[in-house]
């Protein structure tokens, strides 16, 4: 599956291979399923590439640990990260330290923006922007500043409840805006 990446996803995939093989599934069937598998919606989901900039929906990144896994899937960096939402008040030091290594621009949305900005500055992130409660504003800002080979990643590290009913709705809104560009 060419759009399937990230160390945590590979670990899950290997576990599934071992379990299905141990249960008696033939290797050719396992291989066919793996080739067809495109990942799971809202989990490091590749949405679209526009002028060499690829947009990823990781709306399921509803906590710091999940969003750190998403950042770790981009060891080369070159990211514009859209983060924020309903603030769970979790510690941000490790998340922002990793973001400082991988993220060129941090775009913050929602209730958590102020606290996330303070933590990002403390971690040494230079380019921090805020777009209030506007996903469209965040995406349009990312589109304006992104240059190939950068990627735009929505991985909020927050719940969605300040702006959306759930992470699925947030992810669908993100994809809808990106696909309308």
Residue ranges of model-derived segments:
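C-terminal helical cap/extension that packs against the catalytic core
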Residues: 93-150
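Phosphate-binding loop of NTP-binding sites
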Residues: 140, 144, 162, 173-181
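Short beta-strands and strand-loop turn motifs
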Residues: 153-157
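Short, well-ordered alpha-helices that flank and scaffold nucleotide-derived cofactor binding pockets
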Residues: 21, 69-72, 97, 118, ...
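Nucleotide phosphate-binding/pyrophosphate-handling subdomain across enzymes
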Residues: 2-104
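Short glycine-rich, flexible loops that bind phosphorylated cofactors or substrates
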Residues: 115, 160-162
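Short, solvent-exposed loop/turn segments at secondary-structure boundaries
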Residues: 164-167
């Amino acid at each position: 599956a060419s759009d399937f990446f990230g160390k945590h996803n590979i670990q899950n995939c290997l576990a599934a291979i071992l379990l299905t093989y141990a249960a008696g599934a033939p290797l050719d069937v396992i291989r066919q399923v793996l080739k067809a598998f495109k990942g799971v919606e809202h989990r490091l989901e590749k949405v679209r590439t526009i002028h060499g900039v690829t947009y990823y929906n990781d709306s399921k990144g509803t906590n710091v640990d999940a969003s750190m896994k998403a950042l770790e899937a981009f060891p080369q960096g070159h990211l514009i990260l859209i983060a924020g939402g309903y603030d769970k008040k979790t510690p941000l030091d490790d998340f922002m330290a990793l973001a400082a290594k991988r993220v060129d621009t941090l775009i913050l949305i929602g209730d958590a923006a102020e606290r996330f900005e303070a933590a990002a500055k403390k971690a040494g992130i230079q380019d921090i922007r805020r777009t209030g409660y506007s996903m469209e504003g965040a995406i349009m800002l990312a589109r304006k500043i992104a240059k190939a080979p950068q990627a735009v990643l929505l991985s909020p590290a927050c719940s969605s409840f300040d702006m959306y009913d759930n992470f699925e709705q947030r992810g669908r809104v993100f994809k809808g805006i990106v696909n309308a560009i």
